[in-house]
From Swiss-Prot:
The UniProt record lists the keyword Aminoacyl-tRNA synthetase: no
Keywords from the UniProt entry: Cell inner membrane, Cell membrane, Membrane, Transmembrane, Transmembrane helix, Transport
Example GO BP: transmembrane transport
Disulfide bonds: none
Protein name, per record: Probable metal transport system membrane protein CT_069
Amino acid sequence: MLSCIFQDTIFLSSFLAVSLICMTTALWGTILLVERQPLLSESLSHACYPGLLIGALLSYKVPAFSDSLWVIIFFGCLASVLGCLGISFLEKKLAMHKDSALCLVLVSFFGVGVILVSYVKDCCPLLYNKINAYLYGQAATLGYTEAKLALIIFCLSAVVLWWWYRQISVAIFDREFAYSCGLRTRTAELVVLVFISLVIVSGVRSVGILLISAMFVAPPLSARQLSDRLSTILILSSIFGGICGALGCYFSVAFTCQTVVEGKPISIILPTGPLVVFFAGVLVFLCLIFSWKTGWITRYFRRKWFLFSRDEEHLLKIFWYLREQNTYQVGMRDFVRSRKYQEYFGDKVFPRFRMFLLCKKGLVSCSEHQWSLTDKGLARAAKLVRAHRLWESYLVSQLDFNKNEVHHFAEEMEHVLTDELDSTLSQMLQDPDYDPHQREIPKRTRKSDGC
């Protein structure tokens, strides 16, 4: 079945066109996402609607422009650029909030488009059926001309992003620095605007005005979960966009079938545009869940591991506090009844498994049911207690906390004290010997002892 589908020239042209369009929208969508303007694609896609209709009317009415794709693209891009200029005017001249300006331009231009559609419906019924493809998408009507156009736009987009990469990246992350370096960021911004408008206009027939903004957002959002580098995000985003477009096209054809309802044959056709967006949404969901950097599962296990490590460190601190009371070896019952154990673990039973792990790590030893710290465990516990008491000293001396209110904060912060931060705090506090409660602060060891 797969080979039969790809031998169909009509399917192959629409397949290539949609895949290339989705790859291009993903490229420029990455720029919008990093600039924190993902809704701009939604506004510009609706703003181009009246321009597309005017271009379609001219190509239908004027013999010189008969069935000219370039006329439609030109007026669509013009309307989209005007929409962007309108947003900028509302923001800068009328001090309108960004979101309000986006919404106003969206509804205003789209309203004009709806008025034009009502006119077209009465005077040009044949054209009316054709322009519905702009609103909802109709990938099956995309031929090799559209596929070639999509390929040209994709190649131009890749070249422009490569050529203007430095200007665009600097303008995104530090506009003032770009101005001070003399980089032509204004030209780069204009190029980005023109290409976004061109991509929207050339792609509305594949996904539709109502859904094309999803392809500007979903693939970059998926790629952002996997990398922090702009260049990597651009590449991954383009790949994801192409995959979503290809899957949407294939499944819209593969799952088309006929059935019989009340004796009448009915064709069940899955539209390409919604399927493309559906797969893009599934991809975002999978990346949000399974991303190895920021995915929900990764964060869940990272948090569980932190809590597990924190409890191990609390056990070591309990041994330290017992040593301060001259108890160097302790049995299970006395350990559980100690004040610090009750503070950290409440009424929980003796943690045999955690103690077993601490023994395996060489931090705790057990002899005749008596537990004690090893030299390695003592160094680890000293580092934790030092971190706790340094943080208490910092909060009291530098941030004017009451000394009776800092214990809880220090309990949370002691687990994230690095060697560099330890040195910084020691210098800032002039290497104190005692904390605000007049308890001795353990001295820093030269070697972290596996900490």
